[in-house]
């Protein structure tokens, strides 16, 4: 499933990055020290954290995309860093739980 497919399933907004990427797995969490050891390459990372530290962790862990839940807005300095580092970021009005259930249903074709 591509990020474009995910965006459509979530009625999310692309903040920056490449929608053609294909994800593999999902990680949900806001504690950055934990995310550094848990987010895997090509995962979707669902969080409400929107500062430059999230982008710094993403440059180390290489998720397919970061999805900001609950209409969280990516801070301007974080957006600039994401663009400079090729990090794909989306924002969604949905809760982290609802994002997970919709992604799961979309993957299963439900």
Regions found by a protein language model. Name each.
Residues 23, 33-44, 49-110:
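Feature captures the catalytic cores and cofactor-binding loops of soluble hydro-lyases/lyases
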Residues 3-43:
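N-terminal first-folded block
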């Amino acid at each position: 499933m591509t990020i474009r497919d995910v965006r459509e399933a979530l009625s999310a907004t692309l903040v920056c990055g490449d929608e053609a990427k294909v994800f593999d797995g999902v990680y949900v969490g806001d504690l950055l020290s934990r995310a550094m050891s848990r987010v895997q390459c090509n995962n979707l990372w669902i969080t409400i954290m929107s500062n430059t530290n999230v982008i710094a962790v993403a440059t180390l862990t290489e998720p397919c995309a970061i999805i900001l839940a609950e209409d969280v807005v990516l801070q301007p300095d974080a957006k600039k860093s994401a663009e400079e580092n090729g990090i794909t970021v989306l924002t969604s009005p949905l809760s982290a739980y609802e994002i997970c259930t919709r992604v799961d249903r979309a993957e299963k074709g439900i």
